[in-house]
């Protein structure tokens, strides 16, 4: 009696699924992932509560004697974006709440992606991975997907923290003429916009290899070049058009920069 042994074909799909499982398992076992998510949850609570407590306080410049009155947030959603007011002015434009808001998470995800990828090269994991089974293109795809999921979780955590901070401070949840649909579209647009930023961070990280400081400096510097476009593309009054633009832009950046990252890995040393 003959026994036939069939070997499962190690296709692109199987290799990618295997790498994604390993990367997500490693991500959820990494301490700094939970630290970054915890920071994303706590930061909006601290900022909202502290700014609310300082509302109306007066500080005097000792040199000029000029008094400055601190203005706290008037609305919970100022941590998400700029709200329209009755007189047509923006609520939360260039003040503290306008600068220290949910858009900071686009820079926070850079920290995680850089540390995760540079650790692969520093520990020798990436070199062993490419030697045994994985292809460099699959590595780039896996790291991009992982970074996107991490970025989405950071945005959701910040959103939850914003609601908690507003509730603790007793701020208004009024959308000032906007709708819940606009708020949902705003969050979806921001999540999809992560597909623009994450490939940039992946590219810089694979180029920096084991040099975490270089990856962080390059990613934060490169991200800042596009950072100012975030509130314009994903305003609080976002519509399906904003979501579509972020989706198309994200796909173009993911494909284009992913191909460049793959090329960089093929043409450079792994150490």
What is the predicted function of each stretch?
Residues 2-7, 23-27, 251-271:
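Junction motif at the cytosolic side of a transmembrane helix
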Residues 2-41:
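Aromatic- and glycine-rich beta-strand/loop motifs that create alpha-glucan
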Residues 7-9, 33, 37-116, 141-208, ...:
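Secretory targeting signals
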Residues 15, 135-136:
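Short coil/turn motifs that cap or connect alpha-helices
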Residues 42-48, 220-231:
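Aromatic-anchored segments of alpha-helical transmembrane domains
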Residues 113-132:
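Transmembrane helix boundary and interhelical loop/hinge segments in multi-pass membrane proteins
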Residues 235-246, 267-271:
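Membrane-interfacial helix-loop-helix junctions in multi-pass membrane proteins
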């Amino acid at each position: 009696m003959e026994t036939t042994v069939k070997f499962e074909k190690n296709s692109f799909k199987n290799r990618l699924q295997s790498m994604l499982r390993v990367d997500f398992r490693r991500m959820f076992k990494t301490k700094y992932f939970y630290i970054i998510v915890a920071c994303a949850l706590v930061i909006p609570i601290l900022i909202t509560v502290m700014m609310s407590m300082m509302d109306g306080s007066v500080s005097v410049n000792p040199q000029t004697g000029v008094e400055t009155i601190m203005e706290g947030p008037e609305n919970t959603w100022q941590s998400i974006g700029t709200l329209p007011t009755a007189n047509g002015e923006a609520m939360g434009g260039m003040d503290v709440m306008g600068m220290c808001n949910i858009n900071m998470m686009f820079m926070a995800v850079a920290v995680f992606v850089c540390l995760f990828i540079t650790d692969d090269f520093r520990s020798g994991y990436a070199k062993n991975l490419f030697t045994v089974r994985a292809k460099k293109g699959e590595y780039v795809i896996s790291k991009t997907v992982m970074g996107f999921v991490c970025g989405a979780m950071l945005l959701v955590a910040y959103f939850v923290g914003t609601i908690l901070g507003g509730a603790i401070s007793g701020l208004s949840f009024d959308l000032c003429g906007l709708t819940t649909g606009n708020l949902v579209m705003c969050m979806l647009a921001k999540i999809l916009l992560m597909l623009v930023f994450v490939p940039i961070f992946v590219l810089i990280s694979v180029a920096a290899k084991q040099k975490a400081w270089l990856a962080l400096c390059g990613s934060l510097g490169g991200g800042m070049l596009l950072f100012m476009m975030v509130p314009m593309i994903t305003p609080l009054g976002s519509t399906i058009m904003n979501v579509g633009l972020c989706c198309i832009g994200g796909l173009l950046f993911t494909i284009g920069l992913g191909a460049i990252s793959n090329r960089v890995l093929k043409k450079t040393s792994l150490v």
